[in-house]
UniProtKB/Swiss-Prot annotation:
The gene is rimM. This is Ribosome maturation factor RimM. Gene3D superfamilies: PRC-barrel domain (2.30.30.240), RimM (2.40.30.60). One of its GO terms (biological process) is ribosomal small subunit biogenesis. HAMAP family: Ribosome_mat_RimM (MF_00014). The PRC barrel domain binds ribosomal protein uS19. It comes from Psychrobacter cryohalolentis (strain ATCC BAA-1226 / DSM 17306 / VKM B-2378 / K5). An accessory protein needed during the final step in the assembly of 30S ribosomal subunit, possibly for assembly of the head region. Essential for efficient processing of 16S rRNA. May be needed both before and after RbfA during the maturation of 16S rRNA. It has affinity for free ribosomal 30S subunits but not for 70S ribosomes. GO terms for molecular function: ribosome binding. One of its GO terms (cellular component) is cytoplasm. It is found in: Cytoplasm. Coiled coil: none annotated. The keyword Cell membrane does not apply. The lineage of its organism: Bacteria, Pseudomonadati, Pseudomonadota, Gammaproteobacteria, Moraxellales. Residues 100-177 form the PRC barrel domain. It comes from the Bacteria.
């Protein structure tokens, strides 16, 4: 068994959801572009109250509009019931470099968001998918324009420029939205 990696070297790739059936299967929410691509990335780590623990997929399949999986560490539904909400992580250095103008969500979290009027709207605290497109949750800071939380679509018409070196995202998003 490999030793637990440093948490700062990890990237979140998904989350376990409610149990499916009686044999320890769980619904899996994937944060990968192709939701089944999550199963091509190994090894997985799960974040628990006692630290990072390995999680090994025994089997998986598409089920309706989602995906379910069975794990070596989860023998039955009773254990599966305790796993709802557990986050899934991989070591970032095993992932390929993103293509030009593509980003891993974990690289975007904590970036400062500025609009075209040069107003500081806040920092990205979360990226999530709605089905139509990804959304940036932008939280106010002590230095931001106001105390409003904003949900800004991650879309080519909205995101003007990303500068990972300067840790900023420029958006076409007026402050009164």
């Amino acid at each position: 068994m490999s030793s637990a990696p440093n948490a700062s070297a990890l990237m979140k790739i998904g989350q376990l959801k409610k149990p499916y059936g009686i044999k320890g299967w769980l619904w899996v929410f994937s944060e990968t572009d192709d939701r089944t691509a999550i199963f091509d990335i190994k090894p997985w780590w799960m974040k628990t109250a006692t630290g990072m623990k390995p999680l090994t997929v025994k089997a998986w399949r598409e089920q309706g509009t989602g995906i379910v999986a069975q794990f070596e560490q989860i023998p039955d539904r009773n254990v599966a019931e305790t796993m709802n909400g557990v986050t899934l992580w991989v070591e970032q250095d095993i992932l390929p470099e993103p293509a030009e103008d593509e980003y891993y969500w974990s690289d975007l979290v904590s970036l400062r968001v500025m609009n075209e009027q040069d107003e500081y709207l806040g920092d990205i605290t979360e990226m999530f998918e709605t089905g139509a497109h990804a959304i940036m949750r932008v939280a106010a800071t002590t230095d931001s324009l106001d105390k409003e939380e904003r949900l800004i679509p991650w879309h080519k018409q909205t995101v003007v420029k990303v500068d990972l070196t300067e840790k900023t995202v420029l958006v076409a998003w007026p402050s009164d939205y």
